[in-house]
Design a protein with these regions (language model features):
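Membrane-interface helix-loop junctions and terminal tails of multi-pass membrane proteins
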Residues: 1-199
Length: 199
C-alpha cells in the first residue's frame, strides 16, 4: 500500500536516490511523526504519569554528556541509521532471497539497539525520537529535548541518505528508468540495470 517506510530517514534516503517522489515526502513525514506522537500518547493514556518515571522506558531518546559527546552521538546515530538503510536496500533488492525482509530488518534493528542503545538510546528514526520527546515535554518531564533532538534528526537523515548512495555505488542495483510511482512500491530490479546499460 505505502511501502511501509515507517521511518522518515528511510523516506528521505529513498527520495534522495530517486526511489520515491519528493512530492510525497511531506505527507509521509507527517504521517510518521503523527504515528509516533500518537503512540507516545497511547502509552501515557494506558499507564498514566507513572510512565515518565521510567525515563528511557518511555522511549525518550537521550545521551549522557559525561559518556557521549554531542558530536559522538551524531556520528553513532548516523552510522547506525546508515547500517539499517543499507540492510533495507540489500534485502529488498530482487537479487536477494524473497520472504526474508521482515526477519532480516528486525534482526538488524535488534543488533543496533543492543550496541548503540547504551550510547544514544538508538533512535535510528527521527519520528521515534520526536514523538516521545514532545509528549514528555507536554508532561513537563523533559526540558532539554531541543538540544537532544538536534543530535538525532540530522544524523538519522544524513546517515540514511549516505548509505543509500553508497549502496547504489557498491551494489549497482539499477538505473532508474521506471516510472517513479512504480519504483515506490516495487523493489529494485537487477534486470532494469542491465537493460538500461544497453540503451
Amino acid at each position: 500500500m505505502s511501502g511501509c517506510h515507517i521511518n522518515p530517514a528511510v523516506t528521505f534516503a529513498l527520495a534522495a536516490t530517486k526511489r520515491f517522489p519528493w512530492g510525497g515526502v511531506p505527507a509521509y513525514w507527517a504521517a510518521q511523526v503523527a504515528g509516533a506522537i500518537g503512540g507516545a500518547l497511547a502509552i501515557w493514556a494506558s499507564f498514566g504519569s507513572r510512565v515518565f518515571d521510567f525515563g528511557a522506558g518511555f522511549g525518550v531518546v537521550d545521551f549522557n554528556n559525561d559518556v557521549t559527546s554531542w558530536g559522538s552521538a551524531m556520528f553513532v546515530e548516523a552510522l547506525a541509521t546508515g547500517i539499517l538503510m543499507f540492510a533495507i536496500l540489500g534485502i529488498v533488492d530482487t537479487r536477494s532471497p524473497e520472504g526474508w525482509a521482515g526477519l532480516v530488518i528486525g534482526l538488524v534493528v535488534v543488533a543496533i539497539i543492543i550496541t548503540v542503545g547504551p550510547l544514544t538510546s538508538a533512535s535510528i528514526n527521527p519520528a521515534r525520537a520526536l514523538g516521545p520527546l514532545l509528549v514528555s515535554d507536554l508532561n513537563g518531564s523533559f526540558h532539554n529535548w531541543t538540544e537532544q533532538l538536534f543530535a538525532y534528526i540530522p544524523a538519522n537523515l544524513g546517515g540514511a541518505a549516505i548509505a543509500a548512495f553508497v549502496y547504489d555505488w557498491v551494489a549497482k542495483p539499477r538505473i532508474v528508468q521506471r516510472p517513479i510511482k512504480e519504483a515506490v512500491t516495487e523493489p529494485d530490479r537487477a534486470d532494469a540495470y542491465e537493460s538500461a546499460a544497453h540503451v
